[in-house]
Regions:
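Active-site palm subdomain of RNA-directed nucleic acid polymerases
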Residues: 199-207, 211, 597-618
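Conserved catalytic palm subdomain of right-hand nucleotidyl-transferase polymerases, strongest
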Residues: 5-6, 73, 114-115, 391-407
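A common structural junction motif
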Residues: 481, 635-643
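Active-site-proximal helix-loop-helix substrate-binding element of RNase H-like nuclease domains
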Residues: 27-37, 41-200, 355, 435-440, ...
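Generic long, charged, amphipathic alpha-helical segments
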Residues: 431-452, 558-606
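A short acidic-Thr-Gly-centered motif at the start of a beta-strand
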Residues: 1-2, 60-64, 383-398, 603-605
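Conserved "right-hand" nucleotidyltransferase catalytic core of DNA-directed polymerases
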Residues: 1-16, 27, 34-36, 124, ...
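Short active-site loop/helix that positions an aromatic residue
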Residues: 76-91, 123, 264-269, 405-419, ...
Length: 660
């Protein structure tokens, strides 16, 4: 046997969406109900485990044989579930695939697993089996009754008089439904195999599978949580919200001061008309509101802070050994191949600005509500700032947090050949000061000569690198930072004039992509290759990885200009036709290349215990003797395919995760 395509149906009393597959399989009642498989492309078989059937010995052997490639759609689910099931059946025990000091858990080695969901994402398609089937027009899509059957057999049911008070539906409770469920299981394997056939001409490069396997190892390893801090933070938030609600009721006499509608009406009755009670809007109102209304708005701000949701997610996801696993979705952003967050959502953790973070953390950890309230006043904000600190290294270890310095700006300058910017990076200069200096033709130093211009340099750098104009400056908060409306267009013009190679790069990329779609003409710009093939626009990066745009064609944008359109997941999370153009493609290319550089660093440091990666940052669980400087030097090495690109990684050591 060379390959095994698999789909399983499982039961657990835990909510998979809320806790993730690692915790899901730790439920005492977890079990595999159906095991659908095809060995070496033969007709699909289904093993009805729930009814007492057994998986053939040669298939069991293949699951633990690293010479057999296992395929599944979202293979992580099958791999982790089967790891638990095989352990329960005495087939697979104490078979750690890493060294004893690692915490990858007793899971099947991911190196012999491949995932058609990842292949689909690599091809620019959705991350759901139904979505991929619909886009590819596969005849054997998931049966529409599938979701209802999963809910019926795979999740606990409410006890009722009609069902005899049972809390779980078994095959004998609905034989017809069970027969349909088995057909559905077979269909899933067939669809998964059809996807492989459809994509056979466009294999995923081996380096991407290696990245996937490293990603799975990091997800298996997980990261330790300080559960004492988590529990105390949740308890403190509950008390804080109760106190704030009482205070609000006293001031407003409202039945429910948390109600947006009631609060808007109360403010209106007190002379303050509001359209929204969003964070920005409340901050603006606080500048001009009378003192009595300011007090109410400040309390409203504190009540609206969702500081506890991340802690609750941690509580739901933490495994029996105190670690959270499965937090990173490989290829979650399929335009660039970047990761997406799962469960705790590491990519959008609140920042920390408290100067005495460790002291605040200590007070919360020991449940000193009065101390926190006395020293920090805003309890929800304090709890929010402490969320990162719930992630801790295992006993006897430290965290080394290292990230790339201005990686996107460096990659953009390298691609475009913007020499002055590359020189700034090479000399370790401040790009915001240097940008302001280029735009306004005067020296600019942070906290020094013309230091006030640095802010303009910063906002321009953040907003204008990918074709942004006045609207992008506003969206980035230029007006709130003190710039006036009539300063914005001159700032755009000044930035573009001082970065002419970048502007040229935008439109060279635009032209190459347009030629590929319009004339099927292959092209190359700065080492980036374009071609149209089998109804796909492919952009090949210097790393060798391809970006895929599905069913590209020409359209007309809102300005009446010819543009490229393609199919993808839009802002509404639905599959739709999207527009793109040169600067937007440059953003995809730069972010994708930055992602590839991070992957190169992860491979370089794969001998370390990487526990987390957030944007361009790695968090490593290191023994006390590991040298920070050496680790940062290794992370900052330039990949062989990026000759001339100047990288730098900076880091710090800490006993709990934080933003330094």
């Amino acid at each position: 046997m060379k390959t095994l395509s698999i789909d399983i149906e499982t039961y657990s009393s835990l909510d998979l969406a809320k806790c993730g597959v690692y915790k899901y399989t730790e439920a005492t009642d977890f079990d595999i109900l159906l095991f659908g498989y095809s060995a070496d492309g033969n007709p699909v078989q289904v093993v009805d485990l729930a009814s007492g059937e057994t998986i053939p010995p040669e298939v069991i052997a293949a699951l633990t044989n690293d010479d057999v490639t296992k395929w599944a759609f979202n293979a992580q689910f099958e791999r982790i579930c089967l790891s638990r099931w095989l352990r329960d059946h005495g087939v697979f025990d104490n078979a750690y695939y890493s060294i004893p000091e690692d915490t990858v858990g007793n899971y099947l080695d991911p190196s012999s697993w491949k995932c058609t969901m990842i292949w689909s994402a690599y091809m620019g398609l959705p991350l759901s089996l139904e979505g991929v089937g619909a886009v590819l027009g596969l005849g054997k899509q998931k049966l529409t009754e599938g979701k209802a059957l999963i809910k019926y057999f795979c999740q606990p049911c409410a006890p009722t008089k009609a069902n005899g008070g049972r809390t779980r539906n078994l095959p004998e409770n609905a034989p017809d439904k069970w027969a349909a469920f088995k057909r559905y299981n077979i269909r899933d394997v067939e669809v998964e195999m059809s996807i492989q056939e459809k994509f056979a001409k466009f294999p995923v490069p081996e380096m991407v599978w290696e990245q996937y396997h490293l990603d799975q190892e990091i997800n298996d390893r997980g990261v330790a949580l300080d559960m004492e801090l988590v529990h105390q933070a949740i308890a403190m938030d509950t008390r804080s919200r109760a106190d704030l609600t009482v205070a609000m009721k006293k001031l407003t006499a409202l039945d429910n001061p948390n109600s947006v509608q009631q609060m808007k009406q109360w403010l209106s009755d007190n002379g303050l008309e509001v359209d929204s009670l969003g964070k920005k809007e409340v901050a603006e109102m606080l500048k001009t509101a009378p003192a009595d209304l300011q007090k109410v708005l400040l309390l409203r701000q504190q009540l609206a802070k969702s500081s506890v949701k991340k802690y609750q997610a941690m509580e739901k996801a933490v495994c029996a050994d105190g670690r959270a696993r499965g937090m990173f979705q490989f290829y979650g952003a399929n335009r660039t191949g970047r990761w997406a967050g799962r469960i705790i959502q590491m990519q959008n953790l609140p920042q920390n600005h408290l100067p005495d973070l460790a002291e605040a953390r200590g007070l919360v950890r020991c449940g000193d509500f009065e101390g926190v309230e006395l020293l920090y006043e805003d309890v929800p904000d304090t709890l929010s700032q402490l969320i990162r600190t719930a992630f801790v290294p295992k006993p006897g270890y430290k965290f080394i947090v290292s990230d790339f310095s201005a990686i996107e700006a460096r990659v953009l300058a390298w691609f475009a050949g913007e020499i002055w910017r590359q020189e700034v990076f090479e000399k370790g200069g401040d790009i915001y000061c240097a940008s302001a200096s280029q735009m306004f033709k005067v020296p600019v130093e942070k906290h020094g000569v013309n230091g006030h211009l640095r802010q303009k340099g910063k906002i321009a750098e953040l907003a204008l690198g990918y074709g942004g104009s006045v609207g992008a400056l506003k969206a980035m908060g230029a007006l709130e930072m003190g710039l006036s409306e009539d300063e914005l267009q001159p700032l755009v013009t000044a930035w573009r004039n001082s970065n002419q190679n970048i502007v040229r790069f935008w439109w060279d990329i635009d032209r190459a992509a347009m030629n590929a779609v319009k004339y099927h003409m292959d092209g190359e710009v700065c080492g980036i290759k374009f071609c149209c093939q089998s109804g796909m626009l492919f952009i090949t990066l210097p790393s060798g990885r391809r970006l895929s745009y599905v069913k590209p064609k020409l359209g007309t944008n809102q300005f009446g200009r010819e543009c490229i359109t393609y199919e993808g997941i839009g802002g509404t999370k639905k599959w739709e036709r999207l527009e793109t153009y040169g600067p937007k493609l440059v953003e995809n290319i730069v972010q994708a290349t930055s992602r590839d550089i991070l992957c190169y660093a992860m491979r370089t440091l794969s001998h370390c215990f990487i526990t987390m990666h957030i944007h361009d940052e790695l968090v490593i669980e290191a023994s006390p003797g590991v040298d920070l400087k050496v680790l940062c030097e290794q992370m900052g090495r330039t990949p062989p395919w990026a000759d001339g690109l100047k990288l730098r990684a900076d880091g710090y050591e800490t006993m709990f995760y934080k933003k330094d």
